[in-house]
A protein has these predicted regions:
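His/Glu-rich zincin catalytic helix
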Residues: 1-81, 188-295
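Acidic/histidine-enriched segments that form metal/cofactor-coordinating
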Residues: 77-190, 296
Length: 296
């Protein structure tokens, strides 16, 4: 296990990449009462065209399937995982972004048990055609709800204006029409491709002993049989430099008009830390110019 020290922050981060490829980070915080855990896969709403595990050709899946899969993982044959977390005194949740799907919990007690629950429910999928059809109605209602949210419509309207072909322009949840095509087999195909430990990261922060919890995680993973996983191949449509639409006006029942302005990034060559540095620099500049504390 590697110890990474941040002298300026007086923090010590512990890291290890397990034999199956899972990356584990543990940040011990003395004096904290609550522990937070996230289990994240490098898979989001934009990953709709890829070569499946053991496949040789690209396949395209319906928009919104990553978010749909996130919902379905909480449902098991013997009940809902949320109830198990609740019985163990934990608050659990999950979210899907453009590039990530994360499952998480926070608790002040039974941390080891809750961690076991988190890892196991994510790594033990259970899908049936019946439950998939039922979920379509539930997520359909969620999509309708967001369609009535002015801020949500404003943000995705701006993204749609900027991008011509890239799937980032599509709502993370998809559309009622797109999710109607999702099947049990599609969910398993996406799960088997993107939920391999080598494509995932586990992060723990709280009053925990790194050695103890790393051993606990290793013991859990050693019980499971994961074969080597080849690098995931994704494909995205080429994106022109020009925007899709320069302006769009949407009429909704709001008291105060809202406006967003977007600047499309062209040929961004940075990645990793350099990309993060650029993003933080831009956010700092925008806060300096437009935040509530700005003099402008």
């Amino acid at each position: 296990m590697e110890k990474i020290e941040f002298a300026q922050l007086q923090e010590e981060l512990y890291y290890e990449k397990l034999a199956n490829g899972l990356k584990v980070y543990i940040l011990p915080k003395k004096g904290f009462n609550k522990t937070f855990c996230t289990f994240t896969t490098n898979y989001g709403s934009v990953d709709n065209t890829f070569i499946p595990l053991d496949g040789s050709e690209f396949t395209q899946v319906p928009d919104g399937i990553a978010h749909f899969l996130e919902h379905k993982l909480f449902e098991k044959e013997d009940g809902d995982v949320f109830q198990e977390f609740s019985k163990q005194g934990a608050s659990a949740n999950a979210f899907t972004s453009f590039t990530r799907t994360a499952y998480l919990f926070s608790s002040t007690s039974n941390v080891a048990n809750n961690l076991e629950t988190l890892i196991n429910f994510v790594q033990e999928p259970y899908f049936t055609e019946k439950t998939v059809e039922k979920e379509k109605g539930i997520i359909g209602q969620e999509i309708t709800m967001y369609d009535d949210n002015p801020d949500w419509r404003l943000y995705f309207g701006l993204i749609d204006n900027m991008y011509v072909n890239h799937p980032v322009k599509i709502d993370i949840a998809g559309t009622i029409e797109s999710i109607s095509h999702i099947t049990k087999d599609m969910l398993y195909e996406c799960y088997n491709t993107f939920y391999h430990p080598s494509n995932m990261l586990l992060f723990i922060v709280g009053p925990v002993d790194p050695e103890e919890y790393m051993a606990h995680i290793k013991e859990n993973q050693e019980k499971k049989d994961y074969t080597n996983h080849s690098k995931i191949q994704r494909k995205f449509a080429s994106e022109p430099e020009h925007v899709n639409k320069e302006k769009q006006v949407l009429k909704m029942n709001v008291h105060t008009s809202k406006c967003l302005i977007g600047i499309k990034g062209i040929d961004v060559e940075q990645s990793g830390k350099e990309m993060m540095k650029q993003e933080w620099s831009i956010n700092l500049l925008l806060d300096f110019l437009f935040s509530e504390s700005s003099e402008n």
